């Protein structure tokens, strides 16, 4: 085994970080120690994970994640269509002036209201029940599903819930996994908004990850989703 790879695997950060990456977590620059470790050993860990048929990716925004190949040896799950729609809304909010005005803090209610405002409400109600009438009860159930989705995306490292108020959160740069493919000169926020309103498919390269062992209250948001495979 190459010396530097041996050093990487012997590092005390590796066991927990490896588990997080395999569970689909994105490691951003705010995670100082883990991010610095990945920067130091990126080349060696790319070779290590290649043996499992997954790629260690460093995104242009600086965060790291594992991207599965079709022959990956690491178990995969899927994100539901609602998960991905909420992810697109989070990316839109990340690009919004409100993020700076609010010191980067949003509430779960603001997320829900933005979702209802920007996405097709009839389609959203189908996530609750195919025969949904849009009743107050259906809207309440949708709001509960959005909260569950937010918790799933938290585990993926895309949002951080504030420790003193679990109704408030900040958004990380990892939500750019849900971002539109923006051509030079275009307004990223406008392109993202068009993608949300048009209901375009997610341009995710290889899929996102989720550890099924942590699927508390998420059984209805799992493999019957969009079919985008996850490690």
UniProtKB/Swiss-Prot annotation:
Highest taxon, organism lineage: Bacteria
Annotated Gene Ontology cellular component terms: cytoplasm; nucleoid
Short name of any one Pfam family annotated for the protein: MukE
UniProt region (Disordered), positions on chain: 197-231
GO terms, biological process: cell division; chromosome condensation; chromosome segregation; DNA replication
Gene3D superfamilies from the UniProt entry: 1.10.10.2250, MukE-like family, C-terminal domain
Keyword Cell division listed: yes
Keywords: Cell cycle, Cell division, Chromosome partition, Cytoplasm, DNA condensation
InterPro entries: MukE_C, MukE_N, Scp_MukE
Subcellular localization(s) per the UniProt record: Cytoplasm, Nucleoid
Family designation: Belongs to the MukE family.
Subunit annotation: Interacts, and probably forms a ternary complex, with MukF and MukB. The complex formation is stimulated by calcium or magnesium.
Known role: Involved in chromosome condensation, segregation and cell cycle progression. May participate in facilitating chromosome segregation by condensation DNA from both sides of a centrally located replisome during cell division. Probably acts via its interaction with MukB and MukF.
HAMAP family according to UniProt: MukE (MF_01802)
Protein name: Chromosome partition protein MukE
Organism of origin: Photorhabdus laumondii subsp. laumondii (strain DSM 15139 / CIP 105565 / TT01) (Photorhabdus luminescens subsp. laumondii)
């Amino acid at each position: 085994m190459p010396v530097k790879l041996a050093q990487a695997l012997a590092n005390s950060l590796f066991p927990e970080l490896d588990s997080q990456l395999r569970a689909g977590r994105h490691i951003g620059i705010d995670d100082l120690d883990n991010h610095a470790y990945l920067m130091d050993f990126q080349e060696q860990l790319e070779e290590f994970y290649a043996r499992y048929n997954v790629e260690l990716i460093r995104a242009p925004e600086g965060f790291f994640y594992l991207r599965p190949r079709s022959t990956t040896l690491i178990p995969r799950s899927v994100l539901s269509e609602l998960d991905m729609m909420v992810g697109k809304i989070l990316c839109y909010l990340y690009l919004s002036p409100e993020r700076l005005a609010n010191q980067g803090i949003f509430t779960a209610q603001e997320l829900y209201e933005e979702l209802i405002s920007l996405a097709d409400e009839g389609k959203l109600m189908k996530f609750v029940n195919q025969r949904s009438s849009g009743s107050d009860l259906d809207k309440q159930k949708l709001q509960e599903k959005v909260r569950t989705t937010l918790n799933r995306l938290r585990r993926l490292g895309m949002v951080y819930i504030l420790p003193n108020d679990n109704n408030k959160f900040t958004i990380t740069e990892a939500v750019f996994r849900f971002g539109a493919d923006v051509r030079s000169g275009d307004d990223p926020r406008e392109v993202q908004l068009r993608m949300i309103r048009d209901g375009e498919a997610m341009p995710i390269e290889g899929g996102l990850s989720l550890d099924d062992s942590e699927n508390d209250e998420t059984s209805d948001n799992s493999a019957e989703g969009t079919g985008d495979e996850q490690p």
